[in-house]
C-alpha cells in the first residue's frame, strides 16, 4: 500500500527537504485548501526523485514504497503565563497580563519500512544521520503547508521494532522550538503585493488572508500606509530579522518620523534629500547603505493584528514598502 507523509520538512532557507526513500510512480498533489489528490509521475520525474530526492513541484508529496513516513504530527498551542491572586471570598482571581511565553514540543510519530531486517538496520543508520545533521530547520503539517515552525531535535533517535527480525519500526520525536514560539508564513507580504493570493500555491485557507484586493497592498506612493496583518499575532519587526521597511525619499527634510498603529514613533534626526533610501531590516537601520541607528530615537516598530494605519511625518513625497511574514499561534 502506498505510504503518505503527513508533514513537510524545510531547511533553514525554507526550501523543502525530501526524505530519502524508494518510491512508487505516484505522488499526492497538495492544494492550498489542504486537500490533495493522487497524480502519476512521469518517467523523468521518477528518475529525478530516485537520484536526487527532489521534484520540481514543491507541492507534490511522493508516495514511498520503503522509507521513513510521518504517521502523525501534533502541533500544540503556545502556553500562557497567568498570574493569580488567591482571595478567600472569591477564590483565584486572574491579574496582570496573560503573556504567551512558550510552545510545548511538536510531536511527530515516524514509521520506518524496509524490505528486510538488514535493510531496516541500514535505513535506521541513514535516517539517524539525516535527522541529526539537520540542526535548525522548519516543519509544517501537510494540511497547512504554508505555516512553518522553526525547530531542532534535542533527543536520541531510536526506532522500536515489534520483533527483532521484523523490517518495521516506530520512532516518536519531539521537535523543540529554535527561535520564535510562533509559526510563520512561508511567503512574505511583498509576495502578496506582487502576485495576490489566488491560484499561486503560496497561500491557503486558514491563513487569515482576505479576498479584498485592498488588503494586498504593502507599497504606498505619497500615501499614509494602511496595510493588513493576516496572522493571529502582532509582529515585532526587530525580532523578525528578514522583515524590511523601505522608505525612498523624494524631497528634502531635516528629520522625519514613522508612527505605527500602537503609537510607537521611529524618528531619524538627520537631514535627508531626494533619492535617499532608509531601510530597516530587523534590527539594522541604514540610510543609503550607511548605519544610522545612532541618529534615531532607538524605537522599533510593531505590526498590529488586522488593519494597520501608520503615519509618515514631515514628508509628503515618498515611496514606502513593508515586507514581513505573518505569525500564527
PLM regions with names:
Residues 4-10, 111-156, 309:
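Short, acidic/charged, Gly/Pro-enriched secondary-structure junctions
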Residues 1-80:
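Polar/acidic, low-complexity leader/linker segments enriched in S/T/G and N/D
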Residues 14-20, 146-150, 263-269:
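Surface-exposed loop/edge segments in extracytoplasmic proteins
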Residues 90-118, 166-181, 308:
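Oligomerization/assembly interface segments of phage tail-like spikes and tubes
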Residues 67, 73-82, 88-93, 103-109:
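Non-catalytic, solvent-exposed interaction/assembly segments
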Residues 138-184:
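Short beta-strand and beta-hairpin "edge-sheet" elements
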Amino acid at each position: 500500500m502506498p505510504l503518505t507523509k503527513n508533514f513537510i520538512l524545510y531547511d533553514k532557507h525554507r526550501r523543502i527537504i525530501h526524505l530519502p526513500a524508494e518510491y512508487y510512480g505516484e505522488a499526492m498533489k497538495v492544494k492550498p485548501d489542504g486537500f490533495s489528490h493522487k497524480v502519476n509521475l512521469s518517467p523523468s520525474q521518477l528518475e529525478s526523485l530516485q537520484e536526487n530526492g527532489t521534484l520540481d513541484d514543491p507541492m507534490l508529496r511522493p508516495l514511498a514504497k520503503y522509507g521513513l513516513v510521518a504517521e502523525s504530527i501534533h502541533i500544540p498551542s503556545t502556553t500562557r503565563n497567568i498570574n493569580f491572586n488567591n482571595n478567600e471570598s472569591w477564590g483565584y482571581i486572574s491579574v496582570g497580563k496573560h503573556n504567551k511565553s512558550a510552545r510545548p514540543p511538536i510531536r511527530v510519530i515516524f514509521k520506518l519500512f524496509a524490505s528486510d531486517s538488514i535493510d531496516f538496520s541500514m535505513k535506521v543508520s541513514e535516517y539517524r544521520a539525516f535527522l541529526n545533521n539537520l540542526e535548525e530547520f522548519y516543519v509544517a503539517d501537510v494540511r497547512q503547508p504554508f505555516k512553518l515552525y522553526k525547530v531542532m531535535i534535542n533527543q536520541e533517535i531510536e526506532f522500536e521494532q515489534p520483533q527483532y527480525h521484523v523490517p518495521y519500526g516506530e520512532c516518536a520525536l519531539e521537535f523543540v522550538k529554535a527561535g520564535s514560539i510562533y509559526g510563520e508564513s512561508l511567503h512574505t507580504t511583498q509576495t502578496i503585493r506582487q502576485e495576490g493570493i489566488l491560484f499561486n500555491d503560496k497561500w491557503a485557507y486558514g491563513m487569515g488572508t482576505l479576498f479584498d484586493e485592498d488588503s494586498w497592498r504593502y507599497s504606498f506612493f505619497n500615501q499614509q500606509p494602511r496595510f493588513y496583518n493576516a496572522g493571529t499575532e502582532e509582529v515585532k519587526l526587530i525580532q523578525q530579522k528578514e522583515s524590511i521597511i523601505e522608505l525612498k525619499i523624494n524631497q528634502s527634510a531635516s528629520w522625519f518620523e514613522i508612527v505605527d498603529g500602537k503609537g510607537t514613533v521611529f524618528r531619524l534626526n538627520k537631514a535627508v534629500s531626494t533619492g535617499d533610501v532608509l531601510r530597516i531590516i530587523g534590527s539594522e537601520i541604514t540610510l543609503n547603505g550607511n548605519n544610522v541607528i545612532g541618529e534615531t530615537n532607538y524605537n522599533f516598530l510593531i505590526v498590529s493584528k488586522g488593519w494597520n494605519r501608520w503615519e509618515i511625518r514631515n514628508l509628503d513625497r515618498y515611496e514606502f514598502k513593508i515586507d514581513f511574514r505573518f505569525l500564527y499561534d
